[in-house]
Amino acid sequence: MTEIVNIFKKPHYFNYFTFVIFFLIIFTLISRFIFLDYRAIHHDESLHGYYSWLLSNGFGYTHNPLMHGPLNFHLNALVFLIFGDSDYTLRIAPAVAGTFVVLTPFLFIKIIGRYPSILISVFLLISPIITYFSRFARNDIFIALVSIILIYQVFRYLYMVEGKKNLFLISICLGFIFCIKEISFIIIFILGSFSLIFSSFNPFIKHKLNLNYQFTNIFALLFLLSFPLSMPISSYVFNFFGINLVAPSGALNKIGMPIGNVAI
């Protein structure tokens, strides 16, 4: 018996979810990359662009807290090396990060489901704030992207998807987040406080939650990797006793080298 084949039948790999994702990516790329150089360069962008240009041309990079972390400058310098320097290329790196920000809800698809993921992505796509900072050569969109990935890895560890591998990826996210912007300390404080409340260190809920072990490990990891960066605060205590452990602001010595009466 001859089987009649319907040529209009959808292939097995096609579904409406794939269709939506495809067009979501297309519209996101258009909204992030079209006419990137039409808007005048903002004051902050001019600083980031200039020092990135110096780095890309071999003049080196000197960190200045006024302009936040170094990651933005290194990414811009890499783009300048590959595509040349222009108003358009200055905004390529944040545009790429902004594209991924729109797609990040799909990382949580097993937790929140397909339709909520699509809805959140659409809101991120049309959000004026997210769109603006996705086309703005500053650190804001990078911190948003890495923060979402960090939270995603925390969730994966809580559900023990890949165990120690997730802790390693959390550490990588922390490394990046501290290279972007100072708000990273607030983000780590929020995650750390939440983890501490539900960890084994809290005597009120100890042994009452199945996730005590995971929350304890997350808190320990966040604390141990973040605490060394807070050591300059110790200068207020040690200076009271006449012990100078922290170099003054603007010191030009190499990191780790003594300066004046500084002990370390």
Q: Where are the regions a protein language model picked out?
A:
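Membrane-integral, polyisoprenol-dependent glycosyltransferases
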Residues: 1-264
